[in-house]
Amino acid sequence: MSENIGKIVQVIGAVVDVSFPNGKLPPILTALEIHNPNSIDAPKLICEVAQHLGDDIVRTIAMDATEGLKRGMDVLDTGHPIMAPVGKASLGRIMNVVGQPIDGLGVIDTKTYLPIHRKPPSFLDQNTSVEPLETGIKVIDLLVPFPKGGKMGLFGGAGVGKTVILMEMINNIARQHGGISVFAGVGERTREGNDLYHEMKEAGVLEKAILVYGQMNEPPGARSRVALTALTCAEYFRDEEHQDVLLFIDNIFRFIQAGSEVSALLGRMPSAVGYQPTLGTDLGSLEERITSTHNGSITSVQAVYVPADDLTDPAPATTFSHLDGTLVLSRQIAELGIYPAVDPLDSTSRILEPNFVGEEHYTVARGVQKILQKYKELQDIIAILGMDELSDEDKLVVSRARRIQRFLSQPFHVAETFTGTAGEYVKLEDTIKGFKGILAGEYDHLSESDFYMVGNIDSAVAKYEKRKESK
C-alpha cells in the first residue's frame, strides 16, 4: 500500500495544519508522524487529527514541542490512532503519551501495541460484584472503604496531601497485595514524578508498575491524552492477563484543563467558567472504560485538584458523578497537623453499608462519624463559652472525639524522610478494634497525644506506657 503523505501548511503553537492534496484525508483521531531534523528532543513528532477544515486540510494537535517545524515539511499518515506499548515488557518502565520510553533504559521490547482510543466494555462484559479493598490507611479503610474495581476521587486544594496519599497507596498495595499498578502523571510536577520513580525503585515495587508521564511542561495535546495511554496499559492486563489492576491518575483536573486548552486552540466556544463545551463527553470517554469485567478489574484512584477549594466548580462537579466514593481532604484538618488530612464527615463511599462491609465495621464507622459530628456542633459553644459550660456528657463526647481525631492520623512509609517516623500499614481488623475501644471508653485514661501519629491501638498504649515510665 502506498504511503499517504501530506504537507504542513500552518503551525500555530501546538496546532499544526496539514494539507493532503490527493484528497485522502486521515480520519479524526489518526496519528500523523513528522520527521523534525531541527529538534533534538523530538526528532519524530506525533500529531493527532482533531478537525477537517475543508480544502483537503486537517487540523492536528501536536503531542510534543513544535519548534523547528516549517511549512512544506512532509507528514506521514500512520493509518491508526496513537498506539501504546502494552504487556509485561512495559512493567518497571516510564513512558510518555505516545509510548516512547523516557527513563533512558532503551526501547520497550514488546510486539503488542493497542490504540489509546477504545470503546468501553459492553453491559454484558461488565461485572457488578462488590468487595472492599484494604489500603492499610486507617481513615480510608474505616470510613471511606474502596470498592475493588471501583473509582475513588481524592478531592483537595493545593498542598493538602493528595499526591502523598496516592504514593502511599501505590506503596501499600504493591507490597501487601502484589498487584500491578499503572500510574498516570497528568500535568503535575516533574519533581514528584521523579520522586515517585526513585521511591518505588528503592521499595522494590517498580517491577509491578508502569509509569506514564505527561507533566506540567508538556503541550496540552500530551496532557489531554496521557491518561488514555495509561488506561490502555491497564486494560491489557485486565483483559488479556486476567489481573486486578490499580490505576492511579494524578491529576484528573489537569486532564480536564488540558482538554479546555485544546478546545480553545481549536476555536470552540467555551462554556461555563471557560471550560470546554465537551467537558462531560471528554471525561465520560475516559471514566467509562475504567470498570470491572468477568476477566479482571481496574480499581482507580484519582486525585482531583479543586480550584480555589470550590467543590461546585464544573471540573470537580462533573468528576463527582463518575465516582463510587469521594475522599475529601480538608485544609482545616491539615492546619491541625493531622495527616492524612481526610475530612471524615465530608468523605463518602458507596459501599459503607452493612451488606458490603459487615455489621461491626458499619456500626463502628457510623459511631465515629456521629461523635465527630457532635463535636463539630459543640465547637461554636466551646469557642464562645469554653469547655466548663458543657454538660458532663458533652465533655466526654469532646474528649473522645479529640482522641478519635488524632487516632485518624497515621505515619506514612513514603513520608518517612520528612517526618522521621517509620510508616505503618494497619490491618482492617486492627483499625476496627482500635476505634471500637475508643468509642467504648476503654482508652479514656490515655492522653490525646498518645493517639497522634501512631498505627494501631497497641502503638498508642505503648506510647502511654513509655511516657508513664519516663515520669
UniProtKB/Swiss-Prot annotation:
It catalyses: ATP + H2O + 4 H(+)(in) = ADP + phosphate + 5 H(+)(out). It comes from the Bacteria. The keyword Ion transport applies. Keywords: ATP synthesis, ATP-binding, Cell membrane, CF(1), Hydrogen ion transport, Ion transport, Membrane, Nucleotide-binding, Translocase, Transport. Its main location: membrane. This is ATP synthase subunit beta. Belongs to the ATPase alpha/beta chains family. F-type ATPases have 2 components, CF(1) - the catalytic core - and CF(0) - the membrane proton channel. CF(1) has five subunits: alpha(3), beta(3), gamma(1), delta(1), epsilon(1). CF(0) has three main subunits: a(1), b(2) and c(9-12). The alpha and beta chains form an alternating ring which encloses part of the gamma chain. CF(1) is attached to CF(0) by a central stalk formed by the gamma and epsilon chains, while a peripheral stalk is formed by the delta and b chains. It is found in: Cell membrane. Its EC number is 7.1.2.2. Transmembrane segments: none annotated. One of its GO terms (cellular component) is plasma membrane. It holds the Pfam family ATP-synt_ab_N. GO terms for molecular function: ATP binding; ATP hydrolysis activity; proton-transporting ATP synthase activity, rotational mechanism. InterPro entries: AAA+_ATPase, ATP-synt_VA_C, ATP_synth_F1_bsu, ATPase_a/bsu_AS, ATPase_alpha/beta_chains, ATPase_F1/V1/A1_a/bsu_N, ATPase_F1/V1/A1_a/bsu_N_sf, ATPase_F1/V1/A1_a/bsu_nucl-bd. It is a peripheral membrane protein. It comes from Lawsonia intracellularis (strain PHE/MN1-00). ATP binds at residues 156-163. It is an enzyme of class 7 (translocase). Produces ATP from ADP in the presence of a proton gradient across the membrane. The catalytic sites are hosted primarily by the beta subunits.
